[in-house]
């Protein structure tokens, strides 16, 4: 560990390290009672004026290499980061996370400038100092909050809080008549740079609000704030309220259009389904009809079968005539031969006809003899 003497001081009064050789007495042999990093997140970080470091052991200066190698548990590396922290956002949190994780065993102190200093050197803030203090207390990376932090770090302030290193982005911060308020810290070898988070800053957030001022004014009027609270004139208030009513009507019309579109889509889907079902049923009906009444349908075949049966019933087929050589069955008697006799009551129509009938009768008698 470097040996620090009162003679080895920079022009600003901040002591410098003379060498990197360890002293005759190691750090492990010195008992430290410095506050330890927070092990629980169930309570906010304390304020420095409520629980400041009361350690009586000598506070030897550390080099960055020594701090990165690690220090005893009871001697954490005390890292300081300061700022305004107005509208605390993720860029602030990431910067504090980098400061907290610079060394294996670190204790992060965060200084927050008061309203008077901030309004004097930078400008008006959205949040007051009490709100900004509380925002830092509830950040998980912060171990201690220093209220009313100085704009430019002095040797007395660094000695009072036993600060080992100062963490901030490496961009020169010109303010209070200086090109870089951290110049003397860099010269003393106590400055450790962090990286800025691009795309988000307090100024960017304020720019968004100013750019969309009408939108946010209408929003807050709609939520119950008065025109006086928003510093809005009577005419602008009426204009904003009228615009809110117009937006409500537009929203209702939009909702009606969306619902009507949904209804039309549902009707189209159902009609499409009905048409498909109708087509299926119609094809099924046509197929069944053709099976019954088509050219080869079941109805025609049934009609033909029934008609053929009826024809067979009405006109049965005659048995074939027996041949002359076939002998007659003895059980059956020969069918008698009928001779056509002239009707006695009706006289012959002519003498020739009478003679012809008599001759036929005589011939028949002769055959029987």
Curated annotation (Swiss-Prot):
Domain of life the protein comes from: Eukaryota
Keyword annotations: Cytoplasm, Endoplasmic reticulum, Lipid biosynthesis, Lipid metabolism, Nucleotidyltransferase, Phospholipid biosynthesis, Phospholipid metabolism, Phosphoprotein, Transferase
CDD domains assigned to the protein according to its UniProt record, in alphabetical order: CCT
Sequence positions that bind phosphocholine: 122, 151
UniProt record, GO biological process: CDP-choline pathway; ovarian follicle development; phosphatidylcholine biosynthetic process; response to vasopressin; spermatogenesis
A single Gene Ontology CC term: endoplasmic reticulum
EC numbers, comma separated: 2.7.7.15
Catalytic activity: phosphocholine + CTP + H(+) = CDP-choline + diphosphate
Post-translational modification Phosphoserine, affected residues: 315, 319, 322-323, 329, 331, 335, 346, 349-350, 355, 360, 362
Amino acid composition bias (Low complexity), ranges on this chain: 319-339, 351-362
Chain positions found as Phosphothreonine: 345
Subcellular location: Endoplasmic reticulum; Cytoplasm
Subunit structure: Homodimer.
Annotated protein name in UniProt: Choline-phosphate cytidylyltransferase B
Taxonomic source organism: Rattus norvegicus (Rat)
Classification lineage: Eukaryota, Metazoa, Chordata, Craniata, Vertebrata
């Amino acid at each position: 560990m470097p040996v620090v003497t009162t003679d080895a001081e920079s022009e600003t009064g901040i002591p410098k390290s003379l060498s990197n050789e360890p002293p005759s007495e190691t750090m492990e042999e010195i008992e430290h009672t410095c506050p330890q990093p927070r092990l629980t997140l169930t309570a906010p970080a304390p304020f420095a004026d409520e629980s400041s470091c009361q350690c009586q052991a000598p506070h030897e200066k550390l080099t960055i290499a020594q701090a990165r190698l690690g220090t005893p548990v009871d001697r954490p590396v005390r890292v300081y980061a300061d700022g305004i922290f107005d509208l605390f956002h993720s860029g602030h949190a990431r910067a504090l996370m980098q400061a907290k994780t610079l060394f294996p065993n670190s204790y992060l102190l965060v200084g927050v400038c008061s309203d008077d200093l901030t309004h004097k050197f930078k400008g008006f803030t959205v949040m007051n100092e009490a709100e900004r203090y509380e925002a830092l207390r509830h950040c998980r990376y912060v171990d201690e909050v220093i209220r009313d932090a100085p704009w430019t770090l002095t040797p007395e302030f660094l000695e009072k809080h036993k600060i080992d290193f100062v963490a901030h982005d490496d961009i020169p911060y010109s303010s209070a008549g200086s090109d870089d308020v951290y110049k003397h810290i860099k010269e003393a070898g106590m400055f450790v740079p962090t990286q800025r988070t691009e795309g988000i800053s307090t100024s960017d957030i304020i720019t968004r609000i100013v750019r969309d001022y009408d939108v946010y004014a209408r929003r807050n009027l709609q939520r119950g704030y008065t025109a006086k609270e928003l510093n809005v004139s009577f005419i602008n208030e009426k204009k904003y309220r009228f615009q809110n009513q117009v937006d409500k009507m537009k929203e209702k019309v939009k909702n009606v259009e969306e619902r009507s579109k949904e209804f039309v889509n549902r009707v189209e889907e159902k009609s499409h389904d009905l048409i498909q079902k109708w087509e299926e049923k119609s094809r099924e009906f046509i197929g069944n009809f053709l099976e019954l009444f088509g050219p080869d349908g079941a109805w025609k075949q049934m009609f033909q079968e029934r008609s053929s049966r009826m024809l067979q019933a009405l006109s049965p087929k005659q048995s074939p005539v027996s041949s002359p050589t076939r002998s007659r069955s003895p059980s059956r008697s020969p069918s008698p031969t009928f001779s056509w006799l002239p009707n006695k009551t009706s006289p012959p129509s002519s003498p020739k006809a009478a003679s012809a009938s008599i001759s036929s009768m005589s011939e028949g008698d002769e055959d029987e003899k």
